[in-house]
From Swiss-Prot:
Protein name in the entry: L-lactate dehydrogenase B chain
Membership in a protein family: Belongs to the LDH/MDH superfamily. LDH family.
Active-site annotation: H194 (proton acceptor)
Its membrane topology: Peripheral membrane protein
Species: Pan troglodytes (Chimpanzee)
EC number: 1.1.1.27
Amino acid sequence: MATLKEKLIAPVAEEEATIPNNKITVVGVGQVGMACAISILGKSLADELALVDVLEDKLKGEMMDLQHGSLFLQTPKIVADKDYSVTANSKIVVVTAGVRQQEGESRLNLVQRNVNVFKFIIPQIVKYSPDCIIIVVSNPVDILTYVTWKLSGLPKHRVIGSGCNLDSARFRYLMAEKLGIHPSSCHGWILGEHGDSSVAVWSGVNVAGVSLQELNPEMGTDNDSENWKEVHKMVVESAYEVIKLKGYTNWAIGLSVADLIESMLKNLSRIHPVSTMVKGMYGIENEVFLSLPCILNARGLTSVINQKLKDDEVAQLKKSADTLWDIQKDLKDL
């Protein structure tokens, strides 16, 4: 007796399992992981989305909730499991998992606890998707990108930290607000370490090719009557303020990660400030990851732009590199 489905649908091609073309995995379904997931779905970047976490109920609930929105999305398959086999054949894996910093906890201690989490996660990712590109989002992102690179054995062009992509987006938004224009028309770069010791490259800030520092030579310095330096200070403080107000940040970082993925999956060769291995650049001698303007395309992070930096900016980069290496050199089990 033919089923309703058999009566309704006459097959033309043989049914066979197809390997996804643009599968994306998000590891960790906390606030940041789910913001990445919804941003990826909203931009229709994946033909399959996989979610992984250790919390099975939360994981299943998030998966079902997204699946129920399938009518409004163009991603035909949304799957989730605590077993990493669900991630097989991913093009891109986004890592948002990790432990939170406890009050009074040193960064070294926080990083070491995250190393122990990553020691479980990273080998599993590589086992099931040996050709994937990994985007690390968990904080402290620059150190955890190094940790991921070490644990994965992947070439450095396939291990990328979300780095200063969001810091630069915040910077451009805040400057554009002051000027009354759209952030996409206000160009500026924040480089180096994600967070407190990031470097604002004032010499490169421009609107329609007009250098703002040429109009105001004191821009970014303490002598600036318009106090543009405050904009960079606001970038650094903005995450803390959002956390104070709502408990965490998630939407902007989710959108920022989807932006990086779009550049790679669509082979756009756009330039983003993301965390990459900077040994040998700007006189940095250790294996640390910091954000520089990088070209992202289908192969991953394929090139770095040689940004003209001033001496004090290079000094800041080196200082960040030393700070990171101080922590990295004491990490166990890498």
